[in-house]
Structure formats: structure tokens, C-alpha cells
């Protein structure tokens, strides 16, 4: 009996990095590969599609500009991670190693390149992350989610889109139905892992400024950090129906049933909004490295699929005004939803798996580019 070919996927331990990697892992497993996931300890609460036997934790750390001793410690941890990766790859003998962003991808991808494995990285954002920027020099191909195909590595960059989990693709089949007349208006608010606390402050302030007629229609679903009880009390005192939680396991389904979304502009959020096709107000996280969230949001806003307001400009008064407009202009929201849907890339998972197989087969990048290039991917 022939052994299955091994593919190793590497991702940082947050949902934004892990979810695309998991989506591709499921697709490649269905194609007969033995897929392993390498990540860091933060991943335990996110990993669901890869079993414990196929999940490997490698030491990693983030470079900062702190004390020199901290820098030495970081270098030591990364070297330790390289040693762990070397031992793992000698055991698994992968035919392909792919990275999905975050500093934990650095040791395994660098080791894979030194071992002359076939390698690729996937960059979700419109602006390449710092770890990927270094790794781009060593890998055979770069798969872009929102990435521009210009610059130093344009010759090996393929714009494929961001892989979507099956739950997102299922949610994408639910058509957008505007809230007409006095019907309930579902308002979904989430801030990702960064900046949710800002929404916990600004949203109730804005709701307090709305007239009673609109407030009665609102059905708020809000993802928060640690303000659940306090926020629920605030909404109850205003007579607003709300559901508040630190995490929703069925977020894709909730997005599909939303009439309007308030969100940060991480690559995963932007692409899921596009694939599902929902109108959104995007507030880029102002402290994101290299302002990648602003660039992500601009791609969706450019086609009329979203509105953008900077955090410093989003006052309670402005949000209340935008919410009032949204509730009173259902057909405008429907138009925005259709615009977002047109640029969504629901087949990115399959196409990235196709690219991976093409690389394993030794096909040239020019052949792969011709088959997978799509300038409209979002």
C-alpha cells in the first residue's frame, strides 16, 4: 500500500491565519494527501478541522524593538523553533510546505527552504506582512488574497483570493433580504482580535441617539471582549434587543442573516463579507502594522461593497446617522450587498489547492499563473 504524500501547512495561532490554512487542509485531505498543521500554542481554541495527531506546536516569538536582551531571547526561541521544524520535517518528509502568515511561520518555512522543499506562502492582506516579506525571498510561489501583483516579487505572485471554510461557503448561499417597513433590522458588530473594545463603547452611545422607532427595529448581535454583562444592561435599559458574547461559533451564519455589518477590516473579515455578500461599515484598526486594514477596506469600498470611516472620525453622532440611513434605505443596502458579492472569491480554497498540486508536480510558475491569475480577486 502506497503511503500518502505529506503536505505541511504552517500558520500563526490566530483565527485570521488558521482559518484559511484549515480550509486548504480539508481540501487537500479530500484529494488524498496527509496534511499536517504547524502552529503555536495560541491555536488550541481555534483548531477544529485538524486532529491532535496532525497538529504540531513549534516555538516562536515576535520581533519587537524592546530591550536588547528581549531581542536575544526572541532569536533563541526562533532558533529553537527551527530545530523543532528540522526534526519534524526529517520525520514527515513533506512534498510541500505552505505558510499562511504570522511570525510562527518563519522557523518552519525557512527550514523548508534550506531543505529545498517546494514552498509557498499565502498573504491575505493587501499589504504583505513582515514575516511573509522576509519569507517571500525564499519560497517558490506567493498566493495573494488581496495582494497587489506589483513590486519585487510580482513574477512569482498569483492572485488567488482568500480560502474560505465550508461554513462560510454555506452561508454564502443565503440570499440578502432587505429589512422593509417596520420589520426587524439585524445589526452585526464584531471587532476581531483587535479593537473590539472601541465598538463596545461607541455602539451603545450611538444607539442612545436613535429615535425610538428605529431602536425598536434593531436586533443587535455584538462580539465583545469582556464587557458582556455591562453591555447587555445598557441595551436592556434602552429597550433594544441584543445578543452579546466574546465569541460566536456560528459567525458565518450570523453574517448571512445580518442586514448591516460594522466590522474591522482584517483580510478574513473583508473577504467573508464579500463572499457572503453583505453591506458593511468598515473601521480599519488604526494601530495595524503597515496600515494593512485600511488597504483591505479600500479594495471593497472601491467597488461599492462597503463604506469606510476611520476610527478617529467615527463619533457616536456619525454612527447614529449612518445607522439611521441604513435602516431607512433598504434598497441601497441591497445594492451594496450585490456589489460586495460580485467581487467575492468563493473558490479560492480549491484554487489554492490546485496551485499546491501544480507546484508539487513541478509545473512552471508561468503555467500556473495563466491558469489561476484573476485580477478581480477579493
From Swiss-Prot:
Tree of life domain: Bacteria
Originating gene: murG
GO biological process, any: carbohydrate metabolic process
Bilayer disposition of the protein: Peripheral membrane protein
Main location: membrane
Binding site for UDP-N-acetyl-alpha-D-glucosamine: 14-16, 125, 165, 193, 293
InterPro entries: GlcNAc_MurG, Glyco_trans_28_C, GlycoTrans_28_N
This protein's pathway: Cell wall biogenesis; peptidoglycan biosynthesis
Subcellular compartments: Cell inner membrane
UniProt keyword annotations, A-Z: Cell cycle, Cell division, Cell inner membrane, Cell membrane, Cell shape, Cell wall biogenesis/degradation, Glycosyltransferase, Membrane, Peptidoglycan synthesis, Transferase
Catalytic activity, EC: 2.4.1.227
Family: Belongs to the glycosyltransferase 28 family. MurG subfamily.
Descriptive protein name: UDP-N-acetylglucosamine--N-acetylmuramyl-(pentapeptide) pyrophosphoryl-undecaprenol N-acetylglucosamine transferase
Organism field: Bartonella quintana (strain Toulouse) (Rochalimaea quintana)
GO cellular component: plasma membrane
SUPFAM superfamilies noted in UniProt: UDP-Glycosyltransferase/glycogen phosphorylase
Pfam families according to UniProt: Glyco_tran_28_C (PF04101), Glyco_transf_28 (PF03033)
Function: Cell wall formation. Catalyzes the transfer of a GlcNAc subunit on undecaprenyl-pyrophosphoryl-MurNAc-pentapeptide (lipid intermediate I) to form undecaprenyl-pyrophosphoryl-MurNAc-(pentapeptide)GlcNAc (lipid intermediate II).
Reactions catalysed, as given in the entry: di-trans,octa-cis-undecaprenyl diphospho-N-acetyl-alpha-D-muramoyl-L-alanyl-D-glutamyl-meso-2,6-diaminopimeloyl-D-alanyl-D-alanine + UDP-N-acetyl-alpha-D-glucosamine = di-trans,octa-cis-undecaprenyl diphospho-[N-acetyl-alpha-D-glucosaminyl-(1->4)]-N-acetyl-alpha-D-muramoyl-L-alanyl-D-glutamyl-meso-2,6-diaminopimeloyl-D-alanyl-D-alanine + UDP + H(+)
Entry keyword Membrane: yes
GO molecular function: UDP-N-acetyl-D-glucosamine:N-acetylmuramoyl-L-alanyl-D-glutamyl-meso-2,6-diaminopimelyl-D-alanyl-D-alanine-diphosphoundecaprenol 4-beta-N-acetylglucosaminlytransferase activity; undecaprenyldiphospho-muramoylpentapeptide beta-N-acetylglucosaminyltransferase activity
Cell cycle among keywords: yes
